[in-house]
Amino acid sequence: MNKIKTVTVVGANGTMGANVSAIFASFGSATVYMVARDKEKSKKAAIRAGKSVKADSIVNHLIPVDYSNLDECVKASDLVFESAAENLELKIDLHTKIGRSLKKGAVACTGSSGLSITRLAECYPEEVRSQFFGVHMFNPPYQLTLCELTASPYSDMALYADLKAYLTDTLFRTVAESKDLPAFLGNRIGFYVMNEALQYAERYQDNGGIDYIDALLGPFTGRTMPPITTADFVGLDVHKAIVDNIYENTNDYVHEKFVLPAYVQKLIDQKKLGRKSGEGLYKLIKNDSGDKRMMVYDIKLGIYRDEIKYTFPFALRMKKYLR
């Protein structure tokens, strides 16, 4: 594999796109073309990227561009990383365009967290199809080093080995080699847990619902971020795309655990997508004095209410015995 000096990140204005751009620029010391729908969004993403790795100096390595520059950026790049929304048709369109300009020996990859790598590889002309891989970095990548690497049946396995070495030795990723199955490895497990928690919140809405389930499945199970809070952090639109993909393309004993609850779809329809949109399953309110107040969506009433700090008898007994 050629030395990775120039990288293009497609969809760089998104949270993950900006964060991944920062990883390539900081750890990889690469020049990164940040491709977004418009240049102003790309410029703002470059600033966020610097902050995500606590290194404003990398902004000098980040070049904001828009999609009108995609062809020339891809031609100049040693690696092209697509980080667009988790939508198969959108990704097919983008990879078809990338494939027209990808140079021989360069690497193309998708940051998809679970869509078919084989299907996306088929967007590329035969002469460069072997250069395409799945590289799913976990969010936020500066703090979570886990990275899923996935080949397609068309992949050049020598190039795959070189890419794995680059991810490990240069970008300091902890690489998990994954099969090309819906949601790969991490999200097949993680989104099963999150979606089941959302289902339980609906089932136990009379007990409190969302924050009730999070209180049970958070610290008591060793999680620093409870599962429903995690879904809010990921984005409800992304959550839906992943669980819908798993539901449509699998049929195992946990199939029904990937059915999206109706109240989550309702929030998505209202553009309440979670932390990135300012409200979703949770909503943080700031008053004029700067004090913060966490609200939670009440499934039964369809409104936001104050988050409840639950106490559970088993937790009180545990504290008693631990003293």
Language-model segments: residues:
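N-terminal glycine-rich phosphate-binding loop for ADP-containing cofactors
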Residues: M1-R323
